Amino acid sequence: MLYEKFEHNINNLIGGFGLSKIAIAVSGGSDSVALLYLANIWAKKNNIELFVLSVDHNLRDQSKQEIEYIQNTANDLGLKFYSLFFDHQNNFSNLQERARKGRYDLMTSLCQKLDILVLLTAHHEDDYIENFCLRLERKSGVFGLSSSSVNWHNNTQIIRPLFNIPKSELVNYLATNNIKWFEDQSNLSTKYRRNTIRQKLAKEEVYIKDDIITQQIKVNELIENKFKPELISAIAESVKISEYGFAFLDLIKFSGFSQEVRVQLINFLLIIISGQQRSARFYSVEPILKLIRQSLDFKNTLHGCVIKRMQNKLLIYREFGKKLPESKLLLDKQLVWDNRFRITKNHDIENCVATYLSLEDYKIIKEKLDLEVLKNLSCGNHNAILFTLPIVKILEKVVAIPHISYYDNDIKSFNVSFAPDFTSRFTHFY
């Protein structure tokens, strides 16, 4: 039966953690509504408090009805309900990806406030099949083709207990129990590649899906048993990440790793140093590997980073100028700037802005800057890296560059630590 299968999955995924409360993401579609009812049975059986989270993207006319339905259902089941709102700001560029990140940011931030460690989502077997086909079409490497029923976002564990359950079983469960759900009409639009793949798969014989599932399992086993342990060792042995937000890669040790791990290792560093959330495509990393194999010094850019070879070292630092970091007002004691640096305000100072060093600012204060430590650590690349570091300004005046201990008075009012907003399912431990 469906519940027994679900119970087996969720117990294997989180059964041993001794949690007292868990959150669940519910959209109103068949998948998440089925998950809500299954999780409710399991939570009550295990004396776990279940929190229902729903995000209104304000993109469809029926979204208000869906939120209202989910709230009423949660109330009927005796569960706490939280409605969140994603503001797309009338910007429809790359909307699916932005909405996905936006709702995960909203839900995991709420989980942190509620002291909830685990968020359940309704990704099912068909979703995994579609993802595999999409990534295969995009020529993803073996790491990109792999999947997991456990992920992380914003230090919240994302659990997918429906990973091996087809959508048809979920729909049948709802229909049999006379449970209402909503159909998202955007799932029928062929402007999204995923929908086109879904429609093609629907016309295929069952054995085609079974074959894809078999391929996915083999890839996952290869990652778990071979490449993931190698990647973790590779990071420990060959990578040095500086508090100044740059990294060095030992190319002698790098040459001894498998091709798959080399690609993932470069990607790992690009994400951390750039502050971006997504990894570079496999085909865009390959030219960098080709340059490395030629054993000649080079300087290139990729994924918001400068990649520079210096004999047997590869230096990676953030590219300055192409996409400048957003200036942020230091209203609270701490903030994260450029998705990479955590700035702490040690004293109650008003009108502080975290931003980047402009050429005009540099000309004014350059005679007062001591760059000797940064110069030594970066092997002479201090001038370029200086412009990637956060500074603090008050009324357009540079008052602090904490990394190089520059302050316009004797009070050390700000501290900075390199804390990139990055979590990888391949290297995250719990």
From Swiss-Prot:
Recorded GO cellular component terms are:
cytoplasm
Record carries keyword ATP-binding: yes
Any one Pfam family match given in the protein's UniProt record, by short name: ATP_bind_3
Q: Detail which positions bind ATP.
A: 27-32
**The entry's keywords:** ATP-binding, Cytoplasm, Ligase, Nucleotide-binding, tRNA processing
Entry EC no(s)? 6.3.4.19
Tagged with keyword Phosphoprotein: no
One MF term from GO for this chain?
tRNA(Ile)-lysidine synthase activity
Question: What PANTHER family does the annotation carry?
Answer: TRNA(ILE)-LYSIDINE SYNTHASE-RELATED (PTHR43033:SF1)
Against NCBIfam families, the record matches this protein to:
lysidine_TilS_N
Any domain commentary? The N-terminal region contains the highly conserved SGGXDS motif, predicted to be a P-loop motif involved in ATP binding.
Annotated protein name in UniProt: tRNA(Ile)-lysidine synthase
Source organism per entry reads Rickettsia bellii (strain OSU 85-389)
